[in-house]
């Protein structure tokens, strides 16, 4: 009897943890689809504005020095990095761009110090994003290691 109760408790803990994890993941996706999130282009409400912001930001010089989680980065003029999700945001419109900086390694990365890398992720399928990301990659010395 005791074993059955213990098994039920363990089983219910697993499902409770699974529900908590699902809620966390859902919150991350919801946040990413907000106006200033990296996936704002997936939200019909912001799609057109995001595409226009990408075109506009692509034309700007990449010369703004900022600090992000202990690393100095150079990004496009009149943009900032969203502290919650790490994606770039256009200051003029408030739209999030599908270019995200990570404080961990990625295919396109930069070594900061021994065993510490920063990465950049971007959606190259969206017109203008590849061009903009390449400017930022070049300005910051990121290297693609996953060709």
Regions found by a protein language model. Name each.
Residues 14-94, 121-147:
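N-terminal targeting sequences that direct proteins away from the cytosol to non-cytosolic compartments
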Residues 89-123:
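A short acidic-to-branched-hydrophobic micro-motif
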């Amino acid at each position: 009897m005791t074993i059955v109760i213990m098994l039920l408790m363990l089983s219910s803990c697993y499902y409770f943890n699974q529900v908590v994890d699902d809620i966390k993941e859902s919150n991350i996706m919801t946040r990413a689809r907000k106006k200033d999130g990296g996936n704002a282009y997936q939200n019909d409400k912001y799609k057109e504005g995001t595409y226009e912001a990408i075109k506009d930001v692509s034309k700007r010089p990449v010369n703004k020095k900022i600090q992000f989680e202990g690393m100095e980065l150079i990004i496009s003029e009149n943009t900032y990095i969203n502290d919650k999700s790490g994606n770039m945001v256009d200051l003029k419109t408030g739209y999030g761009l599908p270019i995200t900086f990570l404080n961990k390694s990625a295919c396109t990365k930069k070594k900061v110090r021994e065993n510490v890398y920063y990465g950049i992720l971007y959606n190259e399928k969206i017109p203008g994003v590849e061009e903009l990301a390449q400017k930022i990659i070049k300005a910051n010395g990121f290297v693609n290691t996953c060709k």
